Design a protein with these regions (language model features):
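Intrinsically disordered, low-complexity, charge-biased terminal/linker regions in eukaryotic proteins
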Residues: 1-73
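Cys-His-centered catalytic/binding microenvironment captured across papain-like cysteine peptidases
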Residues: 2-33, 199, 207-276
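Compositionally biased, intrinsically disordered/low-complexity regions enriched for serine, proline
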Residues: 10, 27, 35, 45, ...
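Residues that form ligand- and interface-recognition hot spots within folded domains
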Residues: 123, 141-142, 167, 174, ...
C-alpha cells in the first residue's frame, strides 16, 4: 500500500512557508565540518539535538514508518525520512526541527551547528542523490520586506528554503493570500530539489533549495496594492559556502525509496513560503 502523508487541506496554516523574515542575508563563515561525519541512522543523527528539539525522537518514528511504506527507490529509508522529518510541523512551532535548524544555520557562531552535523550529513546526502533542477520557482511572505532586497544586491539564504512552481499555492490564504502587504519572490535557481514524494505536504509539490544558496537581486518591482515582486537569480560564489558531501554508492542490499518524478520545466509544481 502506498504511504499516505498529511494533506495540506487537512492542516492549519504553516509557519515554515513564511519563515523568510529570519534570513538576514549577510555573508557568514562557510558551513563546514559536517561532511567529515559518518553516515548514520536517523535515530542516531538526532540524538545530539534532542535538547533543542525535544519531540524529535517521536517524530523520527513517524517519519521512518511513513517512508518504510514506500516502494524501493534511490534513497535509503533513513535518507528519505530525514527529508520527511524536515518537512514536519508541530506545536510549539519554535521547537520544530526545521525552525531550530534554520535558525542555527543563520547564526554567526558556527560552533552552534556542531550538534547538527550528523543530521546535516544525512539530509544533504539524501538531497545529493536527487537531481538538481534548473527552473523558476516561487515563494513569498505576508510582509513588505522589499527594502532588504535592493536591485543589484548579492545575498545568501543560509537556511533551507521551501519554494513552489505553482502560483495558485501562494494565492491560498494559508500562504501569501491576495490582500495586505505581500512580498513575492521569483527565483531562477539551479539547485532545487523536488522533494514532494517525501514531504508531509505532498499536495504542494515542494521544491527545496539546500542551505547556503547565493543570489543576486535582478529586479524589485511594486505591483500596487501593497504587493511587491522581487526577482532573484541563483549564482555560484567564488568559494563554496557549504562543503559538499561525498556521494557514496548505495549498497545493493540497502532498502531505498523512489525518487519523485520530475515535471517538465514549463509546468507548474507547487509549494511554500519558508524563505528563511
Amino acid at each position: 500500500m502506498a504511504a499516505k502523508f498529511f494533506d495540506i487541506e487537512e492542516q492549519h496554516p504553516t509557519q515554515r512557508f513564511s519563515d523568510l523574515v529570519g534570513e538576514h542575508c549577510r555573508m557568514l563563515m562557510p558551513i563546514e565540518g559536517y561532511e567529515k561525519k559518518p553516515l548514520v541512522t536517523l535515530e542516531e543523527a538526532v540524538e545530539p539535538i534532542v535538547e533543542y528539539v525535544p519531540d524529535v525522537r517521536r517524530r523520527v518514528y513517524f517519519a521512518k514508518t511513513k517512508c518504510a511504506e514506500l516502494s524501493p527507490g534511490e534513497l535509503s529509508i533513513d535518507e528519505a525520512a530525514s527529508i520527511t522529518l524536515y518537512s514536519m510541523e508541530w506545536q510549539p512551532q519554535d521547537k520544530c526541527l526545521y525552525h531550530v535548524l534554520n535558525k542555527t544555520l543563520r547564526n554567526e557562531n558556527r560552533q552552534k551547528l556542531t550538534p547538527w552535523f550528523l543530521f546535516l550529513k544525512l539530509i544533504l546526502t539524501a538531497l545529493g542523490h536527487l537531481p538538481s533542477m534548473a527552473r523558476t520557482v516561487y515563494r513569498g511572505v505576508k510582509k513588505d520586506i522589499r527594502h532588504e532586497y535592493p536591485e543589484g544586491r548579492t545575498l545568501v539564504w543560509w537556511g533551507f528554503s521551501s519554494c513552489t512552481s505553482k502560483l495558485s499555492v501562494l494565492q491560498n490564504e494559508l500562504f501569501l493570500g491576495r490582500t495586505g502587504p505581500r512580498t513575492f519572490f521569483t527565483i531562477e535557481c539551479d539547485s532545487g530539489k523536488d522533494i514532494r514524494k517525501y514531504s508531509c505536504y505532498q499536495a504542494e509539490d515542494e521544491i527545496l533549495l539546500p542551505a547556503a544558496r547565493q543570489f543576486k537581486v535582478v529586479a524589485c518591482l511594486s505591483q500596487g496594492n501593497d504587493f511587491y515582486m522581487i526577482q532573484l537569480k541563483e549564482i555560484q560564489p567564488l568559494f563554496p559556502l557549504i562543503e559538499l558531501v561525498p556521494q557514496p554508492s548505495p549498497s545493493p542490499a540497502m532498502h531505498i525509496v523512489p525518487k519523485p518524478p520530475i515535471q517538465p520545466a514549463g509546468r507548474n509544481i507547487q509549494k511554500l513560503i519558508d524563505i528563511g
